[in-house]
Structures are given as structure tokens and as C-alpha cells.
Amino acid sequence: MKSKRSTNKAIMKKYSQGSREAQEKQKNDKKNVPVLVITYFVIFIFIGMMVHLVKYVVVDADSDIANSYNKRQNLYAETVIKGQIISDDGVVLAETKTDDDGNETRVYPYSNMFAHAVGYDSNGQAGLEMVSNYYLLTSNQNILYRIYHALSDKKDMGNNVITTLDYDLQSTAYNALGDNDGAVVAIEPSTGKIKAMVSKPDFDPNQISSVIEETANSDSSCLLNRATQGMYPPGSTFKILTTLEYIRENPNYKSYSYECEGDGIFNSVSIHCYNHKVHGTVSLEDSLAYSCNTSFSNIGTKLDMDALNKLCGDFLYNKELPYDGYYKKSSYTMTSKTDKSLIPQTVIGQGETLITPLHNAMVMCAIANGGVLMKPYMMDRIENCDGSVVKKFSKDSYGRIISSAEAQTMTELMLSLIHI
């Protein structure tokens, strides 16, 4: 009996000890929870930092270094002779000449003709000289030559930038613009390749120091690239958007008819056609073909101005453009709340609407490419000094702007211009 009681006491004692141990363990576990949370949090942060570091090294580092605002690029010039800028058809547009004393001079063989597109590389930078500076100051020359140059204290040859620019098209556009101020932009709709970009007044990049000195206080500097930064009323080119909006709001648009008398009053505003020419009875197709101002002002009084505003937004008015160079945003302000007297002028591309030649070319390209806008670009590829391709720039779609059916309809209407 005594033995049994002793056994029970031992069991109770053991159970009591086990219970206390369990309670102690539970208390310790509760104390350890914050420590574990902090540990996992630190591990999570560490993993995140490693992922970010790997991403930067593999993906972002080159683009950051290539950024035109990165001043570290200038350090490359100490060991690399800046490469050439070459047209798509093989014409050298910019190169570095070195004299017997090792002095380097950036030379532009065609001076004014490519001034704004190619830019300059002295007293600052502009154009391709700025955008592609990193590539031009990077060398992928044969490794044996680079070792030899390092041992003999000579510079490596920089890579060459092959552009999308076409010499013949650029020359044609440059000569066609003549002595007029303005700009010409030619883009390949299916790819976004900029084939020509001319701006006037122009300048000689070989004489950039004197040009900057002479134009420092000018309100209309020849250094301004009017193709990307010049703001102009779109004029009759805007009638394409007015036409498209009318078609959207009027499925029976083919039955449209208007009697043009050469001038008219719309929303208390007097509008007249060019030279007050009387076009007579015109359809929608005729209105676009003859660029009939009175017919379009008549159309404008019937349109939903908010819908037209949205259409303009779809074509990137008031928005950022998918373009790497400097540019100004175009402006369109007309809504249903705007003074109605502005409608007749707005729908024919006058009034307060402003657009850059580059942007206007993009609008036309989207229509010509079945409603899809391709991002405009001017660098086709990077080659080393031996002609081997180092980097290729591919075409890139911004996205669909209008439906393919709408693009087809507008293309057919625009073709009527050549049949009048």
C-alpha cells in the first residue's frame, strides 16, 4: 500500500514537472515570436536587395550608363575615339578626325543638311550625338587591338551608330524646304523608322561655337529642332480626325451632302475656303479631297466635342509621345464646355490646337499602318569599327489607336486627294 502511494506521488511529481516544463516552453516560444518575425523580415529584405542588385547588373546598368544625362560617359573619351554616325544607306554623317599631334575634331561632312537630326558634340550636345553618346564612346574592337592600345597608351576605336536616316530622302526634303522656316519628318509607318528629319532655319555643326554665340539672345534660334519642338496649327491635316469622328457618329456618312458657296457663318464665326473658292455640292469624300473649310465647319457644329477630344487623346494630343529624343507635347483644348465660337476653326485645324511635325507624322503613320502606331526611332543598330553588329534596335509597337476598319476607311478617303 505504501509502495503504491509512493508510486502515485512519483507520477504526480513527474506530471507536475512536465506541466511546468511545458509552460516554460510555451513562454519561451512566445518570447521567440518577435525574434523570428524580425529574422524572417531581415532575410526577406536581403533577398529583395539581391534580386534588385542582379536585375540592375543584368538589365538596368547599361541603360543607366547610356542615359544622356550620365556625366560618367565623358570619362570614356579618355580611352576611346568617338565612333561614326552613319546613314542607313552607308553615308558617314559624323566622325572624329585626329591630327598628327593627337588632337581630335568632330567633323560633319554634310554640315547643315543633317544638323538637327545628327546634332553636335561641342559646347554641349544635341540630337543623335547626345542620345547615342554612350554607344559611340564604347568600344567593341577586337580584343587584341584593345590590349595593344592599352600597352602602347593609344585609344580604342569607338562603335559606330547606324541610323535609320536615308541620305537621298533627307537631301530631297532639305532642298524642298528651301529657304522656308519649318520642318519635314518622314517615317516608315510599318516600322517607325525615321527616314528623314529636316528643320529650318538650320546651322553648321562644324561651326557650333560661333553659332551658339550668335544665337544666344535670339527668340527663334536656329538650334531649335522644329521637327520635334516646333508647335504649329495642324491646319487641314486635322480634318482627318474631324472626318473620323463624323464617321463614328454617323454610320450613314456616305449620304452627307453640303452646298459650299466659298464662305459661310458658323456659330457666329465667318469661315471661308482657300481663295473663297466655291466647291458646290460636296460629299464627305469631296470635302476631304477639296479640303473644304466651310463643309468641315458645318460638320463641326454637329459633332460631340467631348468625343472628338477623346479621339484626339487617343492620337496622343496632350500626352507623352513614345519617342526618346527631346520634343514638345501637342495641345488640344476643345470640349463641350469650351466656347462654341471656337468650334468652326478648331475642326479645320486652326484655333488653339498645336502639334509638332513629328507628332503629326505619327498620326498619319498610325492610319497608314492599319490603326497601329509604331514607336518612331532613329538608331537602327550599333556596329564595331570592323562592321560587326553589337546591338540591334527592333521595331516596337505603341499599340492600336483606331480599328483596322476605320484605318482602311480613312486610307481610302485620303487616297481620294490624288484623284481630284
What do the predicted segments below correspond to?
Residues 1-212, 222, 231, 256, ...:
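Periplasmic/cell-envelope proteins involved in peptidoglycan metabolism and beta-lactam response
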Residues 2-5, 9-16, 89, 149, ...:
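Beta-lactam-recognizing serine transpeptidase/beta-lactamase-like catalytic domain environment
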